[in-house]
Amino acid sequence: MQIIVFISNLKWRGSYGQTGNNSIGYYDALGLYAITTSYDQSAATVSSAMPNKALEWETSTQLDLGFDLGLFKNRIILGIDYFNKITDNLITSKVLPNTSGYGSILTNLGKVRFRGFDAEITTRNIVKKDFTWESKFTITYVKNKVLKLPENGRDKNRQGGYSVKMQDGTTKEFGGVAEGEPLGRFYGYKKDFIITTPEQAANARYDTSSKGWDWTTKQKLGVGKKTIGDYEWKDLNGDNIINSNDMFLLGNTIPHTTGGLNNTFTYKGFTLNVYLDFALGHSISNGYLQRQMCNFMNGNTSLPAEILKCWNVGDDPSKAKYARFSGNDSDELNKNFRDNSDVFTQKADYLCIREISLQYALPQALLAKIGLKGLVLTLAGNNLHYFTEVIGLSPEVGASSTYSGSFNTYPPIRKFSIGCKVTL
């Protein structure tokens, strides 16, 4: 066994089991009633949430296989796990047609698989009498896929989303949740180019969200018309009309890889801890920046430096990052910035300095003189800095299963703290 003398520990692990998720309120299945004065200004009780007595627990079936490996007297410890988790009867909110009188209903919807691996490596890099340095690196890679949805006659039994009639007579379906597709996708318009000439404006596609305001003449051209400085959006189905049928896949809000690196240094009574974490493989629709660009005149936002990259008369459109800027996008800019589009879709990968802390434990000889068993002083900072391409407050602002935006949500707080722990 001399060949593997450097292996100090090896342990294989495996498990298989089922767990239930009962994250259902006591009365969610029974519906809700609310008091309203909508009926002739008289108080009345109305049904505000549809009951669903068939609502059940989620059931997750998971397989885990892995091993722990210790090397060089456990100076290096490695752990790797493979997991395959299938969640059935997924609890979700399903959008209902307006004719139902309700917006949505809490229901069980289909089957989803989460599959990937976790890895962790801990190393004791330096071990001396007065100085030590230890590191721990973790990483998780996971992909998800919708396996089964209730039969509804649509392509892939798609729930929600859009059905678009293409010019060749075929139907293209996208958005919502569909079998064989991952969760977390979001859609929007894609810019074709910035209109910079009267000829381009005259030949622009009819845009159902445009009010047709011409800022050069201060006149309305008519609903659907475009003018110089506006975006020309790409036409998905080729009908020369821009509407909800022209939504493209812009990205996925769920990172496929997350992890962190923790380093701990000790020197006599001092302990320095530095923790970094990261997320990779996802996108964000930057609603915070979008709000600043499209609705400045409401007085609730400040001007971002990004407006300096907007197109102006005489600029090379190929070098302009954004369409022409105005303080009133809805009326004067024909909704160039208000609608979801690739203009504000950004790669959301980040590396964050999550925490740095410094502790100092006073020597026992000194503590004995003042009658204390322990005294530890701490200085710490959290959420100190992001390395990311996301413009604005934080790449972690705003996320959900179908959309990721940063409008009106609070970012992780950057904070600094001091502490003193006394043991009597």
PLM feature spans:
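Membrane-proximal, glycine/serine-rich, low-complexity loop/turn segments characteristic
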Residues: 23-36, 153-157, 178, 182, ...
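Subset of outer-membrane beta-barrel
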Residues: 72-76, 126-131, 256-290, 365-367, ...
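Active-site-adjacent bridging/hinge elements
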Residues: 38-43, 91-95, 116, 234-241, ...
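Conserved SET/PR-domain catalytic core that frames the SAM/AdoMet-binding pocket
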Residues: 136, 245, 255-269, 354-359
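Conserved small-residue
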Residues: 107, 124-251, 293, 311-317
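Extracytoplasmic gating/loop element in the C-terminal half of outer-membrane beta-barrel translocons
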Residues: 279-376
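A short local loop/turn or secondary-structure capping micro-motif enriched for an aromatic residue
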Residues: 87-88, 251-253, 281-283, 395-397
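Extracellular/periplasmic, surface-exposed regions of secreted and cell-surface proteins
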Residues: 1-177, 340-424
